[in-house]
Amino acid sequence: LYNLRKREGQDKVDSVHFSSIDTYLETSKRLLETPDPFVIFCEPDLEAPLRAIRGDRPTIFRDIKFEHLPFWDKLPRIVENNKTSPVVWVSPEKFTDLYYLIINHKVEFMRQVADLNTFNTEWFAWVDMRIVLPESGLANLSQWWDPERTNVAMMGLIDRNRPKDRYTFFRNNHGWVAGGFFAGKRAAILDFTTTVIREWKRTLDEGYSPSDETMF
């Protein structure tokens, strides 16, 4: 939510990429009021309003300041990579260097949750809060995940021709799938997240700064 908070209250910001924190909280109630166990990763000052919505439902909060992110040390590399192999800045206010660092942490967060398995469950799903916004165009999808699948399930986003080279692909903000949702059984999730983290670090070393969607 960093970029949304940064731009909140400022004029001339498109609603497709930016919404107020109040809008996020209001539109996410339907999701947050489900009885399923949640592990919520957020900035420290967002725990209170999120906890108020969750009530006594099983919930673990992971409050993390940016400088305490596991891969915070990768930010200088991302900054440098975007100078030499820049991505397409669809919305410059949102797609910043810090954004590319934060958005690629979701697989590490998911890996930690699946590894610890505090709620002793076989199934895991990552959901971006932004998915519940009407502007995302994804809010009304209902058949995201078939629980009987053994592989990781994700949402198809766009059908595009295969790029001619690696840089042509990684310079895009969007890939073939939406990065806001992925789900699966514990073993598949652990394999998927571990692989994405490894490949993301390798891609950074190659001089690119991919988004979560292009990594997926």
Task: Name each region found by the language model.
Residues 131-137, 174-216:
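Catalytic core and acceptor-binding pocket of nucleotide-sugar-dependent glycosyltransferases
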